[in-house]
């Protein structure tokens, strides 16, 4: 019996127009009415989730969101932090040094800010900020490492070829010290070592006294793999890569074909 539904957002809950299909909203409400807990699990920062959560119309429910690829977990009753992992000043200095050696640009996130290091943000960073409804805040390395901010996650952004080059040159080294993932063609992410959506989901499930076997997780991208494998039932979207599909227990329709609703109807309702 499924007691917790863990949903990725981009490419899963959201269609290609970055909207939540009505079929998904309806199915989620039906699942919650059956007692299933909803946990949105996303690489987005919290401020990139809030407008969508409001659209779901779950104001009277206390659900959870896991953001920044597992770095922070919030309860929706007051949006307070219930669990988090953060980068140390030494971590930030290391990531900054990698960015300085490459053509990508480093960004950092705390609960409220989308920070940019190393000068004016490139066009790709600006586009990403627009997608998560955020202004950009330029910050110096000195201020970023001052301890004033709780920095959850770093992201390197550049063109696809620039990000290819960064990954080829530095991913092997970086992944010895951080949890790194190429989440999008133009983004390489770095979280505190051992941090994934799955680790955050595991800790939350323990708090809620829910077993992994009672969790259904859905996703489409590389940063969803650990979560799909952790859950008792891991569902890949029809728009996922063949590799992600091969690691899932089942494949549903795409995010353009109400894939989330179809899976909820099949396994929960």
Regions flagged by a language model, labelled:
Residues 98, 102-218:
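Conserved acidic, metal-coordinating active-site core of Asp-based
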């Amino acid at each position: 019996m499924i007691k917790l539904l863990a949903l990725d957002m981009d490419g899963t809950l959201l269609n290609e127009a970055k909207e939540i299909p009505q079929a998904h909203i309806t199915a989620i409400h039906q699942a919650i009415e059956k007692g299933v807990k909803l946990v949105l699990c996303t690489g987005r920062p919290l401020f990139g989730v809030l407008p969508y959560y409001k659209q779901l119309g779950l104001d009277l429910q206390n659900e959870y969101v896991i953001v920044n690829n597992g770095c922070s977990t919030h309860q929706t009753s007051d949006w307070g932090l219930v669990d988090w992992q953060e980068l140390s000043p030494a971590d930030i200095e290391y990531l900054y040094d990698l960015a300085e050696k490459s053509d990508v640009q480093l960004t950092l996130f705390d609960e409220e800010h989308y920070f940019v290091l190393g000068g004016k943000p490139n066009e790709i960073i600006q586009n990403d900020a627009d997608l998560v409804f955020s202004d950009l805040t330029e910050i110096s390395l000195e201020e970023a490492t001052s301890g004033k901010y709780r920095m959850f996650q770093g992201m390197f952004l550049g063109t696809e070829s620039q990000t290819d080059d960064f990954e080829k040159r530095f991913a092997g080294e970086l992944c010895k010290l951080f949890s790194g993932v190429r989440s999008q063609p133009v983004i390489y992410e770095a979280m505190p070592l051992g941090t994934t959506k799955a680790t955050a989901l595991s800790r939350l499930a323990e708090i809620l006294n829910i077993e992994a076997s009672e969790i259904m997780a859905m996703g489409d991208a590389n940063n969803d793999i650990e979560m799909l494998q952790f859950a008792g039932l891991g569902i890949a979207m029809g728009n996922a890569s063949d590799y992600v599909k091969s690691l899932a227990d089942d494949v549903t329709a795409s995010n353009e074909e109400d894939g989330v609703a179809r899976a909820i109807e099949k396994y929960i309702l």
